[in-house]
Regions:
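Internal alpha-helical transmembrane segments
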Residues: 1-15
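Membrane-interface junctions at the ends of membrane-embedded or membrane-associated helices
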Residues: 136-146, 184-197
Length: 197
C-alpha cells in the first residue's frame, strides 16, 4: 500500500491518490453519444474504433489523453461533468446499463454479445432473485438480525453503489458474492420455512 501511494504521489503530487484513471472511467460512464451506454473503452479503441472516432473520442483523446497525469485527469473529469450537465437522463440510462454489466455482463456498446452472457444470466439471475427476496424480508424484520449481518449488508451496498457509478464488469461483483451469500443465508434461515409433505 505504501509503495503504491508513494508512486502515485510521485506522479500526481497528491498524498492519498489511489488511482489515476478515475477521470477516464467517469468520462466513459457519462458518454451519451448515439449507440453508447457507459461502457468503457481503451485508449486504442477510442482512437481506432470507427464508431468512437465518429463520435469525436479520437480528437478528444489526442488533445487530452497524453497530457501529464493531473492535467489529463482534470480534462477527463471536466468533460464528464459537462456530459452530466448536458444530458442527465442519458447518463442515468448509462448508470442503469452499468448495473446490467455488473451483474450479467451486458449491454456493451458497439460489441457483439457472447454466449458466456447466457451463463452469467443463468447463474446470476437466481442469485439476484434470492438477494431481492432476502432484502424484502430483511427490510421488514431488520431489527431481528445480528448487528454483524446489518453491517455486512451495509458495507456490501455501499460497495455496490460506488462500483455502479463507473463502468462495470461482472468481475467487480465476484468479490462480494460471498458477503451477499452470508447475508442471504442469515435472512432466509431466520424467516423462511419450507415444509415438505
Amino acid at each position: 500500500m505504501v509503495p503504491w501511494l508513494a508512486y502515485t504521489k510521485s506522479k500526481t503530487g497528491d498524498t492519498l491518490c489511489w488511482s489515476t484513471n478515475g477521470g477516464e472511467l467517469l468520462y466513459w460512464a457519462t458518454s451519451t453519444h448515439e449507440g453508447e451506454n457507459g461502457h468503457w473503452f481503451s485508449e486504442e479503441d477510442a482512437q481506432n474504433k470507427p464508431e468512437l472516432v465518429a463520435n469525436g473520442h479520437r480528437d478528444f483523446y489526442r488533445a487530452n489523453y497524453y497530457l501529464p497525469v493531473k492535467e489529463r485527469e482534470a480534462a477527463l473529469k471536466k468533460q464528464a461533468f459537462e456530459n452530466i450537465r448536458a444530458n442527465p437522463k442519458d447518463v442515468l440510462k448509462n448508470w442503469l446499463s452499468n448495473w446490467g454489466r455488473l451483474i450479467f455482463g451486458f449491454p456493451r456498446s458497439y460489441q457483439h454479445e457472447e454466449l458466456i452472457m447466457l451463463v452469467l444470466v443463468g447463474v446470476n439471475a437466481p442469485i439476484l432473485l434470492l438477494i431481492l427476496v432476502a432484502c424484502g424480508i430483511g427490510l421488514k424484520h431488520w431489527r431481528t438480525f445480528p448487528l454483524e449481518i446489518v453491517l455486512l449488508f451495509g458495507v456490501t451496498f455501499i460497495y455496490l453503489g460506488g462500483t455502479s457509478l463507473l463502468p462495470g464488469l461482472p468481475r467487480y461483483t465476484v468479490v462480494i458474492w460471498p458477503w451477499l451469500g452470508l447475508g442471504v443465508a442469515a435472512v432466509l434461515s431466520c424467516h423462511l420455512r419450507l415444509e415438505l409433505k
